[in-house]
Amino acid sequence: MFYSILHTKFFLMIVKNIMKKYLNIGCGSRYHPAFENIDVNPAHPSIIKHNVKKGLPFPANAFEAVYHSHVLEHLPLDKGKAMLEECFKVLQPGGIIRIAVPDLEKMVRF
């Protein structure tokens, strides 16, 4: 968990300093004011209510960075693939995408 938090903070530090348009998918209650935040159950009025199983509500090349943490594993395989395609569609050329998923191998060992 600490490793994930450290990398997320590092990612946010880099992105905030060099990029202007970033998308945070499935943010839950951890939305970032500098991001365009979307979630199926928004925890704050500034978060866009949207189900990613229906695609992303943004045009192509809209963001310099796309981030989602612990979202992909909640989707069926076909919807997960479709969401990844959508992420790359809304990502500008040369943009950054960061995806965090659980380490299933580590979980099985315990």
PLM regions with names:
Residues 65-71, 80:
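A short beta-strand submotif of the Rossmann-like class I SAM-dependent methyltransferase core
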Residues 53-66:
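A short acidic, Gly/Pro-enriched loop at the edge of an enzyme's catalytic core
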Residues 20-55, 105:
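Class I SAM-dependent methyltransferase SAM/SAH-binding core
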Residues 1-19:
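Membrane-proximal basic amphipathic "stem/tether" segments
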Residues 74-75:
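A short His-aromatic
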Residues 71, 87, 101-103:
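Hydrophobic adenine-recognition pocket in adenosine-nucleotide-binding enzymes
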Residues 96-110:
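Conserved class I S-adenosyl-L-methionine
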Residues 81-96:
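A short glycine-rich, Lys/Arg-flanked "PGG" loop and its adjoining helix->strand segment in the class I
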